[in-house]
A protein has these predicted regions:
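Short runs within selected transmembrane alpha-helices of multi-pass transporters and secretion channels
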Residues: 70, 74, 139-157, 165-176, ...
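Helix-terminus/linker motif at the lipid-water interface of multi-pass membrane proteins
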Residues: 28, 32-50, 119-126, 182-189, ...
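Transmembrane helical elements of multi-pass membrane transporters/channels
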Residues: 18-37, 138, 149, 172, ...
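Small-residue-rich hydrophobic transmembrane alpha-helices
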Residues: 49-109, 146-165, 259, 273-331, ...
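Transmembrane alpha-helix boundary and packing residues in multipass membrane permease domains
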Residues: 23, 27, 39, 56, ...
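Membrane-helix interface/capping residues of multi-pass secondary transporters
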Residues: 38, 46-49, 86, 115, ...
């Protein structure tokens, strides 16, 4: 097929690494948008960081919803490529883009209209709440750019061309890095300046994707961006992407509750610690997500082509790679938590509280990487429901655990321990689940249910 890479032949280690590195770098770039905002806004003080941190849960939720079409693209297009069906690959690509636009407009409108009651959930001081509402309304108008770019990224990943999203996202990051200090301090816009800078960068990424697909690439032989939705393709996309989007969205709802609890226990410092710590933790998350996405795309093609031995070897290789990095992140967070947190929020009370969070959370980093790597295996073979079941169940266990630990007198640290314990459980359970079903689900690798 035109414009794609065949992942069913050739050296597995090199293909996985070459595919994972740009995806991982792209994930880091997407993470860097938030970290760049956080680092500059951190110079305004912990209250400003708390304001954008409260919105950060909602932008995370938005990114989670966009996974419906990112994962939907990666798996549906990837399996169509593996099955040598270019017509299906083109149709899936068009359907994913169309669905992404519809969902993003609806979701962005809801956030814009209900920004005030949503932000007031956190019970922050009035001036912090006002800043957060303005920030959210600006960000919400740019959600179509985020959703469509996620769908474009999924299509390129499925085609084995993960370098393209990397370079495009990198361009957006550079623009955001330049605009952040200009808008925040130069124009004196404060937290709103960070929102405007991010909006412009995300719009630029979207426009570059459009130019790349329309004027430079003939990916899949060319396909229309928008199409009349057909039940066959729409149902398959939702079957693949909805469990992933649901588990990540519900995860964000859980974190919204934990954020409120952190705010009650530690006021704006507690909320700031949890949201900023989560952004820093994304170092591990995005690394494992990069390998997981590469593994998913690799397995999708090889599973559809009946290459079971390549599926298993790719799984073993990815576990080894992510295990090394997970161990490194554990050591970094446990022993250098204060120093890492101070890079983003140099206020002493903030980085001391953040250091405690990173130390506790650091114990679970290896297991987080294990969980996300295993998600890539399940997604690649088209079984997105098991990871959703495990993730949703364990994530919701954080709420009663956090309440229990707080009532035991552990304070805000009880919330951190609830997060750590459930993360360990998710990794171990998902690995065990796949080991149990591995023989059965790979016995007829060419079977792809619609």
């Amino acid at each position: 097929m035109q414009g794609i890479k065949n992942l069913t032949q050739g050296p597995i280690n090199r293909q996985l690494f070459n595919l994972a590195m740009p995806i991982m770098a792209t994930s880091f770039i997407q993470m860097a948008y938030s970290l760049t905002d956080m680092a500059w806004v951190g110079r305004l003080g912990s209250e400003a960081v708390a304001a954008i941190g409260s919105v950060g849960i909602l932008t995370w939720m938005s990114g989670s919803i966009s996974l419906l079409n990112k994962v939907g693209s990666e798996v549906s297009v990837g399996q169509s490529i593996g099955a040598q069906s270019q017509e299906d690959a083109r149709s899936f690509a068009s359907h994913n883009i169309t669905i992404a636009l519809i969902i993003s407009i609806c979701w962005g409108t809801l956030l814009f209209i209900f920004a005030e009651p949503i932000i007031r959930i956190y019970e922050l001081e009035d001036h912090i709440t006002a800043n957060a509402i303005q920030y959210l309304r600006i960000i919400s108008t740019g959600l179509p750019f985020i959703f469509l770019s996620a769908a474009f990224t999924g299509i390129y990943n499925a085609a084995g061309r993960s370098k393209v999203p990397f370079f495009i996202s990198g361009t957006g990051l550079i623009l955001n890095i330049i605009l952040d200090p200009l808008f925040i301090f130069g124009f004196g816009l404060g937290t709103n300046g960070a929102a405007y800078a991010t909006w412009i960068a995300e719009a630029s990424v979207f426009l570059i994707f459009v130019y790349q697909l329309r004027c430079r690439d003939a990916l899949l032989g060319g396909f229309p961006f928008f199409t009349r939705l057909k039940k066959k393709y729409t149902r398959r996309i939702f079957k693949l992407g909805l469990p992933v989007a649901t588990l990540n969205t519900l995860f964000a709802f859980v974190n919204m509750f934990l954020c409120r609890t952190a705010s009650e226990q530690g006021e704006h410092i507690g909320l700031m610690t949890f949201t900023t710590g989560g952004q820093i933790e994304a170092i591990t998350w995005n690394t494992s997500q990069g390998f997981s996405t590469a593994l998913s795309a690799f397995i999708a093609q090889n599973y559809a082509a009946g290459r079971v031995e390549r599926v298993l070897r790719a799984w073993y290789t990815t576990l080894w790679m992510t295990g090394i990095f997970g161990t490194f992140c554990t050591l970094l967070f446990v022993f250098f938590g204060n120093e890492v947190f101070a890079i983003f929020v140099p206020e002493q009370a903030a980085y001391e509280a953040g250091g405690v969070f990173l130390r506790i959370d650091g114990y679970s980093q290896l297991f987080m990487m294990l969980e996300i790597t295993m998600q890539g295996v399940f997604y690649g073979i088209g079984r997105t429901i098991p990871p959703a079941i495990i993730s949703i169940s364990c994530n919701y266990m954080r709420i009663p655990l956090a309440i229990l630990f707080v009532r035991m007198g552990m304070g805000v640290e009880g919330i951190w321990w609830a997060v750590c314990i459930t993360t360990v459980a998710k990794g171990l359970i998902l690995l065990s689940w796949f080991i149990i079903i591995k023989k059965k689900c790979l016995s007829i690798p060419s079977t792809i249910k619609g």
